[in-house]
Structure formats: structure tokens, C-alpha cells
């Protein structure tokens, strides 16, 4: 005999849906208000001549693709994209990935002593605020004799150096690698935990060396997490602003003027909000293309 449902009471399925909506609703609303809406508004601004001051600030006009045509024909913007690609490749894809993988492998090594101290030292740059890290490194690499780097050189009888002026891009790449190793280590360490020890031991019994085991056994099994990290670190590194701005402000000249610095200067220093928004949209499209490329290489369905 089927019991009659009491009038006015919801079924368990509807109660579950109601609870799910109640729990997810605030988060979805916050994302819509503070992420999706500003992003859509930024895309709209990219097609206008909006400025911070002047008549265009009061009554912006729709200009279609004019901002994009100007940017794609601008040597300064294209050069900033090239510098951004160089910065992302050497600091994120090469530096952070390789050193992060090395740190994760060392934490799994049985012969390593003091793993807790080693892990803490690697994680330390991650918890230091970007502004604090930037100003600290600016003091360390100062061209003055009081700079920590020059004091160390003086101890060995060498003359003073000015890394931020003589090799600005190399300096910011090294500092960004220092800050990003921690995330790579955490993600790769978690991925390595899923690699069966039996496969590694079997490969060693067959005579495979450490590099052969890593290349033919470990790396194929963590292919997905590696490409996921490459995607995440590419996105975050393209958006690096504070580190470079507080260290060099895009200089000397335009040597470290990345796309993020270029967008900031156009939007806020030159008051060209529409132009800065258009540059952001171009950067977003390039990141989407890179993301699809990473997913294709990793053989991950999107």
C-alpha cells in the first residue's frame, strides 16, 4: 500500500534541490556581481573611447574595432606582448615548473634529511605578500653600496653592480621563479603521491635509472596535473603586475614593460580606459587559445 503524501510537504528531491540552491545561491551571486559583470563591462568598454577625464569620460562613444586596430598596429603593444611571452616562458614554464618538480621529487627522496625545513623554505616566498617581496628585493638589489647584493660583492673584492638597471628582465624572472616554486612543488607533490610505488620498483628491477624511471614511468602518469599547472601558472604569470611595477615600473626604458604594465599605463596614467580594456580583451583571447592548446596537448577533454 502506497502511503499518501501529506499535503503541503515537499518531496525529498525538491527539498534537496532547495537546499542546494540555498547553499550555492550566495556564491553564484557573488561571482556574478564581482567577476562576470565587471568582465562583461570591460569587454563593452573595449569597443568605446571611454576615458577617465574629458568629454569622453562623460559621454563615451562606440568606436567598434578602432581600439583593436590601433593596438594591433602599435609597436609598443606588440613589443609588450613579446616581453610578456618571454617572461612567462622563462619564469613560469621553465623556471617554476622545473624547480618545482625537482623540489617535489626531493621531498619524496628517502635519503633527504630535514624535509620539513626544506619544504618550509620553499613555501616561505608563497606566504610573503607581493608588495613586501618586491620592496625587499628592490632593497637587496639596490645599486647603492648599502644594498645587500653589493655588500656581498664587496666582501669578495668585487665592484658594485646594478642588476635592476643592467639586467632588469633577468632580475624579475629570477624573482618570479623564487615566488612561484612553492605552488609547483605542492601540485607536483600531490600528483606524485598517486604514482604507484610498484611501477617504480618494477622499472628499477628492469635496470632503469632515475632519469629513465621519471621519463617513462612517472611523467606519463602525472601528465594531466603537469599541464594543469602549466595552464594555471601561465594565467597567473601573464597577470603579474605588482612584482614588476614595484621593482622596475616597466623600465629602464621599456625593458620590463609587460602587457600588464602597458594596460595599467594606458588605462590609468594616460586615462585611456577603452584602449586599456581592448588590450585586456586581446590578452584574454590569447590566454584562451593557450588554454585550449594545453588541454589538447594533455589530451584532456574540455
Model-derived segments and spans:
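A structural signal for multi-pass alpha-helical bundles of membrane permease subunits
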Residues: 13-302
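Short, Lys/Arg-rich, polar N-terminal cytosolic tail immediately upstream
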Residues: 1-14
